Amino acid sequence: MGADGETVVLKNMLIGINLILLGSMIKPSECQLEVTTERVQRQSVEEEGGIANYNTSSKEQPVVFNHVYNINVPLDNLCSSGLEASAEQEVSAEDETLAEYMGQTSDHESQVTFTHRINFPKKACPCASSAQVLQELLSRIEMLEREVSVLRDQCNANCCQESAATGQLDYIPHCSGHGNFSFESCGCICNEGWFGKNCSEPYCPLGCSSRGVCVDGQCICDSEYSGDDCSELRCPTDCSSRGLCVDGECVCEEPYTGEDCRELRCPGDCSGKGRCANGTCLCEEGYVGEDCGQRQCLNACSGRGQCEEGLCVCEEGYQGPDCSAVAPPEDLRVAGISDRSIELEWDGPMAVTEYVISYQPTALGGLQLQQRVPGDWSGVTITELEPGLTYNISVYAVISNILSLPITAKVATHLSTPQGLQFKTITETTVEVQWEPFSFSFDGWEISFIPKNNEGGVIAQVPSDVTSFNQTGLKPGEEYIVNVVALKEQARSPPTSASVSTVIDGPTQILVRDVSDTVAFVEWIPPRAKVDFILLKYGLVGGEGGRTTFRLQPPLSQYSVQALRPGSRYEVSVSAVRGTNESDSATTQFTTEIDAPKNLRVGSRTATSLDLEWDNSEAEVQEYKVVYSTLAGEQYHEVLVPRGIGPTTRATLTDLVPGTEYGVGISAVMNSQQSVPATMNARTELDSPRDLMVTASSETSISLIWTKASGPIDHYRITFTPSSGIASEVTVPKDRTSYTLTDLEPGAEYIISVTAERGRQQSLESTVDAFTGFRPISHLHFSHVTSSSVNITWSDPSPPADRLILNYSPRDEEEEMMEVSLDATKRHAVLMGLQPATEYIVNLVAVHGTVTSEPIVGSITTGIDPPKDITISNVTKDSVMVSWSPPVASFDYYRVSYRPTQVGRLDSSVVPNTVTEFTITRLNPATEYEISLNSVRGREESERICTLVHTAMDNPVDLIATNITPTEALLQWKAPVGEVENYVIVLTHFAVAGETILVDGVSEEFRLVDLLPSTHYTATMYATNGPLTSGTISTNFSTLLDPPANLTASEVTRQSALISWQPPRAEIENYVLTYKSTDGSRKELIVDAEDTWIRLEGLLENTDYTVLLQAAQDTTWSSITSTAFTTGGRVFPHPQDCAQHLMNGDTLSGVYPIFLNGELSQKLQVYCDMTTDGGGWIVFQRRQNGQTDFFRKWADYRVGFGNVEDEFWLGLDNIHRITSQGRYELRVDMRDGQEAAFASYDRFSVEDSRNLYKLRIGSYNGTAGDSLSYHQGRPFSTEDRDNDVAVTNCAMSYKGAWWYKNCHRTNLNGKYGESRHSQGINWYHWKGHEFSIPFVEMKMRPYNHRLMAGRKRQSLQF
């Protein structure tokens, strides 16, 4: 059996048990007890007139058992009146028919609830022993309920499932809800007050207690009684509806009293300090209050405060014993001071109507001025003040036109910042600065020059009428911060500052000393400024050959200039360089000395002459000065020799002393200059004994005589050789000039030679043939044979001849014999001008008187001639080419010999006779060689011709450029084998003349600086060592493209930033600018080459950005330069007007979105004027060209029309929504050409459409006159909505739409350009009604915009 079945069984059981118990307990003869049991479900549907007796329960719904007990008293056993009184005391006066007693028992686990209601009829006597019987009944019912509860628990435990009750339950009538159905009588037993079959007819309660008449169940009571059953006594006038009637007496409500509650009661019975009059206390003197319980305050606190204990507690904004005085502002403080304004702040109550600010200079005769601000302001900025003045400032609070006592302060404005600072003249040690004068009085100026490193500085003060100053004594090349400050008493203005750098000073007192032919030593005093390098330039005066430039590192103050051209005029200058700045140069000129002749040598020598030859000086000298003397210095001789045409010059010194060593010095002479001499020592040959003659001869002796040798000698040596061939010698003292040879062979021919000797030096011999006895000239002797001359000697004839005849001719040309007549004393002759390699026939004839002897004949062949015109070319480090002209005579080959002039072996090479040039190889670099050349035929060799040559230096190798940047490159090379004094680097680019750089010989690298970016360079290099230079090597390189410089971000706002840079030095095509944010977004822009800035727009707020910039040229890109910045955030994320846009940093006028009430869903595009009178204006109307028709209907004016960037009307709905956000002010700007006017109103609003968009404006200010106040409070009118008060339709009449009244003083939406009366765009107080204003703008902004903007600026400053 289910739960529903269990519930039905329980219900039936309980009903049955209740009926049985109640029936068995109540006696019918006494009171009748009716018990009704009703089971209902909670939350069941209520029926009209009562509750249904039975409803079928569902499984989930709780079950409620209602037990109703009606105790009826038979009519024939009505109780007496005494009983009735007793009964009335037991029942409540509120009960109508029955006294009810209710009880309830619940079982929450099974959701079964038992309720019991026992009804006793009113005014009935109690049943006999009713209290005891009822108590017993209740006890048994409780026992029954407990048993049923136990039974339910058992059934819930499935103990009754087999015997659960089943069957159909009948419907029990509900007796109209005013009775219970009785099973005994099978009918309704009605409740008290009801009767009828279904208990549906009412009885009057208690029969109206016999104090009234029952009409349709309702009692109509007698006049003294009341109540539903007329059982209550009536109170007088029903307590006047101000109290409760209890047993006929009024219990009055507060604050009423009296029998009928008509009188008012006084509070606290007036505290004994007054009397009550109709509820109001009339207090005694000195007391006040509703209950007269308070002490009276002075003047009743003037109605501006509360009286507490006799003292006034004033309302906000008032003070004083009787609250009659306005409280002054508190805590007056200076928030900011400038030269022409003072910003004040104070604390004040909200009740203040306005504040009056009074200010006056403390100086005698100062004008007192006032300024008024609204009472909700807590600060003000006083403007248009005089700089450097002290002002007495008083601030008054005003309430209802009553001024408070002032709060005061004494504040001095700052001196104005000097303006127009500029520099007129800048030198190494002076700077002339000037600035603009002030228009007000002050004491003077202070000018300071402070070095950037803050070390030292100078300060000067000048009178106030001076506006320029020349500061001297500054350091050259120093950067100074220049400050100009105005002074007045103890006050100082803010400085105006600028930086200036003095010109770097150059080197001074340049001096050239120790000038030689190729070297000069340059000295200077270095500059005082810090410089990057010293630039030394020198070159020939006149510009020939260009200028050589050296970069020298400071603090170098001297330099040796080398490789100069001898005897030349040079100009040298030195200057200092720092960055791109070059100082003035110090310049001087000098002339190099003439170089001495080189390679001085003796070509040939005799006893009385020396043939000298030397290499010409490099200088263009005119002549040479030859000075010579014996080593003893007895006498100096001087001779001037013109410069030879060729590479050498020759000179012959004659009349010398034979056998004497001479010191020779040769100096080059040019104009008045003379070089140092080239010197050498040379010795003349010993003088031969001359005029050797045979004075006598015998069979065994020969007597000789000669002329004494003129030079110093030790002795003479006589050699005599007979024809037999055995030579003999004899030494003769030097003072002898004759000698007789004895013990000779008789009849023999002797060859006798006499030589002078000194030490190991021997003179040429003097030879003579002699005969012992009579002997003729026997034969000729040939010596000193050359290619063009020969020396011939012979013996003396015996006896001596009168004269001698010498004949000679080539063998093949004997018919052309040449004859030479000789003195008889001659014993030798020299034949000159002979042909080389030619056999000559020579005969000698002695003439004795008229007798001619037989000729003595001999032959001699001249030597072969040497090659001519030897030259050197193609000199390299290890080879030279020798060239020459061939000799005349035939020969077999050439022999080329060469050896170092210092120490080294002699090498030779054989060259065929068919060539005239030969390359000598395998030489040492940078070495001087002596090269000789002669021709060879058989065993015969010609004379040698010689020359000197220096082999070239070895080249440096592997020249490369590395570490290349836009302005620098590192040159590296490998040194040559030989010693290097210096390297010379010539740097060229394009067609520009090269720059020469000198590098020390020990270096193998050099850094080039200050190069031009993106430029192709050629670096050529060679080594030098003294006069020698190596071959050149070169390399090419290109500098990189230099990047833009000084990349900066400025004017950073929430969504934009200005990016600027300095362009690279190189020519470029464009820039590539990339910017990226921290969220990973990236954007690349191509920027024209001529641009140096770009404004980035549309950036994200509060975002870090990195900007990368490169320059580009063709396919070449520079390195990247970068910067970073962070965009700002919005003060107002969703601006609701243009003022908030302005405070967000949007300073450009234009179209912006606003969000009404800050809601994103109420977005509106408006035009913002960010410049007029502090900006922040929403423009809602503009007329400027007549292109837009303003004669429109209501619907257009409601939603708006036109272009917000041209002519437009924003719309009445939009204007209303904007002005509903807070207090706004209105400004109307009007222009006619150059003439302008405006009108402003400190309040502006437009009501909604239900109020026809009525206009509300405040107080006027401006220059146009107040023409709009006439329209105050007027609704808007269009041609189809006439809301004006005029007889006609103003909008129709004047072709516009406006807040017309009758009709207008201003008509800003009238017809454009219409000048007829009142038809155009009018503003009466400016241009009248017969002028149409060409330009009009209507705009609004929050009333407190100035204050908010000022506070925002202040917060940004702090």
Curated annotation (Swiss-Prot):
- Where is carbohydrate linked to this protein? 36-37, 55, 176, 180, 198, 271, 278, 302, 392, 470, 581, 791, 874, 1036, 1046, 1261
Phosphoserine-modified residues are: 724
Domain Fibrinogen C-terminal intervals: 1129-1344
User: Is Coiled coil one of the keywords UniProt gives this record?
Assistant: yes
Domain spans labelled Fibronectin type-III: 328-420, 421-505, 506-595, 596-687, 688-777, 778-865, 866-955, 956-1042, 1043-1130
Database matches in PROSITE patterns: EGF_1 (PS00022), EGF_2 (PS01186), FIBRINOGEN_C_2 (PS51406), FN3 (PS50853)
Q: Which domain of life is it from?
A: Eukaryota
Which cysteine pairs are covalently linked by disulfides here? 292-301, 297-312, 314-323
Where, if anywhere, are coiled coils annotated? 127-157
Quote the annotated effect of residue 532 to N. Answer: In NEDSTO; uncertain significance
Q: In which tissues is it expressed?
A: Brain specific.
CDD domains in the cross-refs: FN3, FReD
Q: Name one Pfam family in it.
A: EGF_Teneurin
What biological-process terms (Gene Ontology) are attached? associative learning; axon extension involved in regeneration; axon guidance; cell adhesion; extracellular matrix organization; locomotory exploration behavior; long-term synaptic potentiation; negative regulation of axon extension involved in regeneration
Q: Which Gene3D superfamilies match?
A: Gamma Fibrinogen, chain A, domain 1, Immunoglobulins, Laminin
Q: Where is the signal peptide?
A: 1-31
Q: What is known about its subunit structure?
A: Forms oligomers. Interacts with CNTN1, TNC, and FN1. Interacts with BCAN and ACAN in a calcium-dependent manner. Interacts with SCN2B, PTPRZ1, and CSPG3.
Say which family it is in.
Belongs to the tenascin family.
**Clinical condition linked:** Neurodevelopmental disorder, non-progressive, with spasticity and transient opisthotonus: An autosomal recessive disorder characterized by delayed motor milestones, delayed walking, speech delay, axial hypotonia, and peripheral spasticity apparent from infancy or early childhood. Affected individuals often show transient opisthotonic posturing in infancy, and later show abnormal involuntary movements. Variably impaired intellectual development, and brain myelination defects are present in some patients.
Q: What does this protein do?
A: Neural extracellular matrix (ECM) protein involved in interactions with different cells and matrix components. These interactions can influence cellular behavior by either evoking a stable adhesion and differentiation, or repulsion and inhibition of neurite growth. Binding to cell surface gangliosides inhibits RGD-dependent integrin-mediated cell adhesion and results in an inhibition of PTK2/FAK1 (FAK) phosphorylation and cell detachment. Binding to membrane surface sulfatides results in a oligodendrocyte adhesion and differentiation.
Protein name per UniProt:
Tenascin-R
